[in-house]
Amino acid sequence: MSHETYHANVRSVSRSMLADFIESPAIYHGRYVAKTLERQSETHAMAMGTLTHCAVLQGERLDSMLAVIPDSLLSEDGGLRTKAAKEWKAAQQAEGKIVVKAHEADNQLADIIGMRDAVLGVSVVTDSGVRVRLREDIFQRHGVAIETPFDWIDTESGFPMRAMPDAMVIIDGNAIVVDVKTIADINRAEFAIADSYWLQVAHYTEGVAAAHGVPTDRCLFLFVFVEKSAPYRTRVMQMSANMKAKALEEWRVAVSQLHDRITRDDWNDWRSGELIVVDRFIKGIQ
């Protein structure tokens, strides 16, 4: 299933939909209920991340993933201004390709190859003492589910839910879920998990438990971060047991709040109409 098809489905609750609700009930209502707001359009950085996933997870030929702009379509300032140029770009993007200029193509390919090779070369020992080689033990393992969506019903809220992990294997009643993230600065990876990626761990862990019968404490979720530029440094991270438990609690709170908002048809934003007193001083220029 393509990413576009997966995200177009709003009949069940995905991790990204729940993230939108946590950010703003008004945004959730606009995108998924009233459908007056469009989803964020794909940026160049997002497209590069998608292509890196294709290279790592699906082994697609890299030369088929980029569309080099013909010189004849470029205007004098180097842009795509004509109707023909814009139609060509739209057609390439509809096929999932990233559009680049000829002088950019080599650099883009080098970065994708660098990130792919860095991720596939990762080997790590988990906190339980098990060595995991991403290429052999996960991505190329017999029975691995690569970007395969699954559905479940959340029994407490009654919501239909869905998830699509990058890669998942179930071995002897234990699940290993791997998610690949590209990042500009590898030193920010830990902050990214604490800030927003905790929701992904909780959502997928709940889904694996409900859809595949794997207890939440037997679902290992590994984030594999890879830097977007040379030397393509990597970090493999997992949440501590305490942080994972907290993430699952916060996930349940968010789902319960979404259920309450739908029941009451109340889409006012968090703290809307409330006077917020700021009590943090930002030091100025000396």
Q: Can you annotate each of these PLM segments?
A:
Residues 44, 48, 200, 247:
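Hydrophobic (often cysteine-bearing) scaffold residues that line and stabilize catalytic clefts
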Residues 136-140, 169-176, 209-219:
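Secondary-structure boundary elements
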